[in-house]
Amino acid sequence: MTARLVSILEQLRSIIKRFEVETGAIEKAFVKNDPLAALKLGQARASAMIALGESKIEVSEYAPNYVKKIFAGKGHATKEEIKRMASLQFPKVCFSQTDEADALAIAVCHVHTLKLNANLNRAIKKAM
């Protein structure tokens, strides 16, 4: 497990540097009845947050249902529905795993939310 967490950390450091990442987003932890899965997920999330934090990159967290609602139009979309929507929105991208589509959904949700917040802030300033 340690090697896997180090690998996550190192890969993210490389991506952050290569693509000059300015902002980050992760999904909030959601675990039903599996404490071991919750622990592993928490460790992977920590690796991601450390990589982003080292570079002073702000991290936003989104609830799974919010991501699904923004990306697929319904908050209880299945992994297959997310993958199908990702394929429709990005037809040139081949998603071999549903996790890849999930990651893209989080990124799209983040961009959408940033734009929404910026528009809202402009409207508030204009109204004052």
Model-derived features: positions:
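Phosphate- and other anionic-substrate recognition elements at nucleic-acid/protein interfaces
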Residues: 1-128
